[in-house]
Amino acid sequence: MLPSKVVHRKAVRTVPLLLAALIFAGCTGQAPHTPPANVQGAADGTSDYYLQQVQQSADDNKVDWQLLAIRALLNEGKLPQAGDALTQLPADLNNIQRQERLLLLARLNVARQNLSGATDPLKQIDISALSQQQQVRYYQLQIAVGQGQPSLDVVRAWVALEPLQTSPADKQKNIDETWQALLQIPQQQINTLTINANENVLQGWLDLLGVYKNNVTAPDMLKSAIQDWQTRYPYNPAAKMLPTSLTQAQNLHPASMGKIALLLPLSGQAQVFANAIQKGFNDAKNGVLAQSTVAPSPAGPVQVPAATPGDAAVAVSPSATTSDKAVAEQPAPAINVTTAAPSASTQIQVYDTSSQPVEQLLTQAQNDGATLAIGPLLKSDVDKMLNSQTALNVLALNEPESVQNRPNICYFALSPEDEARDAAHHMWEQGKRAPLLLVPRTSLGDRVNKAFAAEWQKLGGATVLQQQFGSTAELKQGINSGAGIRLSGTPVNVQPQQQAGVTIAGLTIPAPPTDAQPGATSSNGRVDSVYIVATQDEMILIKPMIAMRISSRDNVGLYASSRSYQAGAGPDYRLELEGLQFSDAPLLSGANPALMQQAAKAFNNDYSLVRLYAMGVDAWTLANHFNEMRNQPGFQIKGDTGMLSANQDCIINRKLVWSQYHQGQIVPGT
């Protein structure tokens, strides 16, 4: 037996070792534990954190951490790194990992604005294999892919997303966006939709759309109809939480029409244009518009004088064109608001913008009791009006170079740019993807080029080519030499708007690199369509010069602005332009032959003034529905200058009537 002193000393030496072991064991037990990677859940960490886990994890968890890292890289806008990481994923993924990879691939393509590239991976996804969190991302991507292209698929995605959202704010946002998506679908498409028997929520939404369109001009009737709809569809999300804009529409009151100020130039070069607008406005206001009592029938050719050039600052197509054969108007949308009723009680006071500054006239009009101003007409005066910060509601009769979104201002213009934008939509809807612009070598040509190309880019199109032509003498020289016009050109230089990151359905998409081409459809250098801005004398030379260089097998569509549309040219002219489509206002396309005859007589068949007369008629209707145009999305007017609608800046867009030369006749455009 050892002495007690020895035992005591040994015990003293052992205690620190035991304490150290216990402390070490305690520290080991309290060390942070890394949770397992869950690709079906949220990814709240940074890409650096997930990449570190990739380096430290075993092989069986490495792929999951890689997928989370890719999602974080996308969230941070690091698209090149995310793309590289996607290519480094192994081929032998399990089903959960495969579904996540497809989601990430679609997300990457959406972020790169390659929407077509996002469609294929989304089609391969098995929705039933996704977690609820993944389903949210799936429907967000479906909506993002359909941005700018209204369709029932986008609406279906919004409908499917709604039950997965828990926040009341998110649900309201969903309902508002579902409603906006519905409003953007063309009525022709609505009429042909096929709804599955189990799509009760979607059917309810479509019925609500019908309720809105049938009662849009009567707030009290709209309110009653919505209440009836809520009774019929008590479980529809919108029955419990109406779209915000629909709630506002129920409480919207027409603009005050007690006294209207007309701001027009009553002297100088623009006086003739102002007189035409004023006459159209007064005729509509006083109820002296001729109306056709029978269906429009083809009218005989009308000989008209040469065009009277207009002031370049005035928003009017610079040529005088004529109506030949009456053309049936295109089908109207369901929101069928036509020319406003006349009003004897409305006072009209005209202010001369050529004699006093616009700022002073606006103040004077307000002091005189006006509640709405129509005008000014010249671009320079519109800029001055904006600088005046007037409190009056204003329907400007031109569009400034830099549009400002003001709650009391709308912009209504007739211009070559307006026609060019409509042409871009018409040609896109006809399946054309590689247009060439054939325009005069003037500032007019430059304006048309920029307007068309900018609109084409918004639609998802690739680079637009342009070719300019000179005088009629130059064209004659070209046709005499047999040179023809080759369908080639130089790209229109449209400076893309600086894009910022956007959030769609809760999915944040970082801004793409500045040198990226957003979702463009490549033309591969082959032109499939030509938009021509030319006078009658120029067009009769240009059309055969194009025919010299192409064959009928090339299937190149030819389109033109109203600049070349004249009736007095006779059957030879119409035969020479066989197949050419052209646009014009409904009034000049046979929508109302009686009013057309009245206007043509008043202006001695000067059709540039007839268009401005129609603009005055539509200005009266727009004044009566100013609040609706300014505040109700989807509100449309069947006007004499076109089907009128407004964008978010209250720029009045015109959908024109397209006609076509066919066997010496003028028929509706195909």
From Swiss-Prot:
Membrane topology: Lipid-anchor
Compartments where located: Cell outer membrane
GO molecular function: enzyme regulator activity
Bridged cysteine pairs (disulfide): none
Lipidated residue numbers (S-diacylglycerol cysteine): 27
Any single Gene Ontology cellular-component annotation: periplasmic side of cell outer membrane
Keyword Ligase set for record: no
Signal peptide as annotated in the record: 1-26
Lipidated positions per record (N-palmitoyl cysteine): 27
Predominant place of localization: membrane
Gene3D superfamilies for the chain: 1.25.40.650, 3.40.50.2300, Tetratricopeptide repeat domain
Any GO BP annotation: peptidoglycan biosynthetic process
Keywords, sorted A to Z: Cell outer membrane, Cell shape, Lipoprotein, Membrane, Palmitate, Peptidoglycan synthesis, Signal
One Pfam family here: LppC
Function field: Regulator of peptidoglycan synthesis that is essential for the function of penicillin-binding protein 1A (PBP1a).
Family: Belongs to the LpoA family.
Subunit structure: Interacts with PBP1a.
HAMAP family membership: LpoA (MF_01890)
Record's protein name: Penicillin-binding protein activator LpoA
Organism, scientific name: Erwinia tasmaniensis (strain DSM 17950 / CFBP 7177 / CIP 109463 / NCPPB 4357 / Et1/99)
